[in-house]
Amino acid sequence: MNIIKTLPFFILCLLMSPQAYSDNAVQLTEQRQLFQQAKKALQDNQISRYQMLHKQLDGYPLQGYLQYLYLNGRLSQASNASVSEFLKKEDGSFYAERLRMFWLNKLAQQNRWSDYLNFYQPPQSSARQCYYLQALLASGQKQKAFELTPELWLVPHSQEKACDPVFSAWEAAGLLNNDLRYQRMMLALRANQFSMATYLAKSTANPVDNQQLVKQWQAIHNNPISVFNGLAKNSSLSADTALNREMIIHGLQRLARRSPEQAFTSWSNIKTRYNFSQQDTIEARKAIGKWAALNRDKKALRYFGDIPGGEWQVRAALWQKDWK
């Protein structure tokens, strides 16, 4: 009974839809033309004409983008109120976040830290995060700023210049300790950022030992086979420590890229000298097997051994037709 009652309504909708679609298409075409005219008026700096055309685009999806172009091109004259109004109206759009980024940069350049705090919303770039901490410091919120500083400090690369004043204040407060310096040095080493690691090593509590560590890591990174061949004579690397095991696994992974066979031979000679963990073994054999598989080396499956299966083991088994 309900279907019979509603059927005329659906028939009416179907009969009307072609005309409605046609009207919408005409309106959309007109709006597109208005959009192009408004954009051209902006480019020609015809602001009165732009504003007149902009008002006629209510409901058009790209109306907000036009206003973004208008504000972004005039940030030096923009007010907090106009930017805030735009951000609220276009909240969630990509161009709202872009305008926020550019506006924050402008506020930071002018040291308008109170305004910066009002407009700041994460996530932001490292530079803008550090400007945020500068703003906190300028407003007397030292504790909050210093609580957020370690996250920006603990990166393997040189940090943005905007972070320098924050790091200086943090260090002056006695909060940049040796443990944090060492942690960052290790992050730099693991990211193969050797210049950065050397710089950081000099500021640790044991600069001589840590600079030697950086040199040792860089040596095994650049020429692993040479280090492995002279391992018996290398008193610092021959000790069975967690750090030495990590360096050796890194060297094996590097060597595997150049010669899986040499890497496997080195691994076979080295593995009994150290107390490698199961994960160490997996990482070493996975790297050797993967690079062998990439080279279509028939020994790839042997190099993988009995470690847990992975994508490259499956590929090697398929092209070798060995899926036992």
Identify the residue ranges that each predicted region occupies.
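Bacterial N-terminal signal peptides that target proteins for export
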Residues: 1-8
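N-terminal signal peptide c-region/cleavage motif recognized by signal peptidases
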Residues: 16-17
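Aromatic (phenylalanine/tyrosine) cluster motif
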Residues: 9-10, 21
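Alpha-helical solenoid repeat scaffolds
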Residues: 21-324
